[in-house]
Swiss-Prot record:
Essential cofactor(s): Mg(2+); chloride
Function: Specifically catalyzes the dephosphorylation of 2-phosphoglycolate. Is involved in the dissimilation of the intracellular 2-phosphoglycolate formed during the DNA repair of 3'-phosphoglycolate ends, a major class of DNA lesions induced by oxidative stress.
Organism: Shigella boydii serotype 4 (strain Sb227)
S-adenosyl-L-methionine as UniProt keyword: no
Molecular functions (GO terms): metal ion binding; phosphoglycolate phosphatase activity
Protein origin, superkingdom: Bacteria
Record protein name field: Phosphoglycolate phosphatase
Subunit: Monomer.
KW Membrane (keyword) present: no
GO cellular component: cytosol
């Protein structure tokens, strides 16, 4: 029996699932840290902070940077300089700086993963409504989808500012299913992190976990999605469609 035979719609996470956004996010984080004369983190470290929205990203970046600066100053025999500066105020300033810099680098620092456009096109052609659920700040979402030429595939888009509770809370997924006019158990959710899988489970949606995204350095199988795929186009045969690589061969 096909586990997904009752699926009537598919929703996707964005960062780490459809797009590699780490270069742009890391650049904006580091520019914001540098502007506050804090140590810069680098892409490899920033990747481990992605997934819970910009506010949490700033909190993680600031916590690391303050600790890193304190350690460096201690090794130099210098006193700490952050004790009298409220972390909450620094997070607020860091977020403003991040938003400014990310608006400048988001498009050039974000790339579609392989087979994404073909997979979305095949699902849309099958008549399945497609949704997007991301914790990314809403103002960045639509311009990015347009720049990547994938906005046309989605009938419902939920950004991080569109709901009070972000993933892993089920609210964003439940809202997408409601707008699609289907039950949560009829909507497949595809993501790359434990937040995605936890949200799907809480909403009652079947889930696909992808192995290539930003899952805090954890293997996606630890979150126990219903199915694990190495590539996004592995989703197509499970939904009764030819694999996109096979489809491309037919079109050549």
């Amino acid at each position: 029996m096909n586990k997904f035979e009752d699926i009537r719609g598919v929703a996707f996470d964005l960062d780490g699932t459809l797009v590699d956004s780490a270069p742009g996010l890391a650049a904006a984080v580091d520019m914001a840290l540098y502007a506050l004369e804090l140590p810069v983190a680098g892409e490899e470290r920033v990747i481990t902070w992605i997934g819970n929205g910009a506010d949490v990203l700033m909190e993680r970046a600031l916590a690391w940077a303050r600790q890193e600066r304190a350690t460096l100053r201690k090794t130099m025999g210098k006193p700490p300089v952050d004790d009298d500066i409220p972390a909450e105020e620094q997070v607020r300033i860091l977020r403003k700086l991040f938003d400014r810099y990310y608006s400048e680098v988001a498009e050039e620092g974000t790339f579609l993963f392989p087979h994404v456009a073909d997979t979305l096109g095949a699902l849309q052609a099958k008549g399945l409504p497609l949704g997007l659920v991301t914790n990314k700040p809403t103002p960045f979402v639509a311009p990015l989808l347009e720049a990547l030429d994938i906005a046309k595939y989605f009938s419902v888009v939920i950004g991080g500012d569109d709901v009070q509770n972000k993933k892993p809370h089920p609210d964003p997924l439940l809202l997408v299913a409601e707008r699609m006019g289907i039950a949560p158990q009829q909507m497949l959710f595809v993501g790359d992190s434990r937040n995605d899988i936890q949200a799907a489970k809480a909403a009652g949606c079947p889930s696909v976990g992808l192995t290539y995204g930003y899952n805090y350095g954890e293997a996606i199988d630890l979150s126990q999605p219903d199915v694990i795929y190495q590539s996004i186009n592995d989703l197509l045969p499970a939904l009764g469609l030819p694999h996109s690589e096979n489809q491309e061969s037919k079109n050549d």
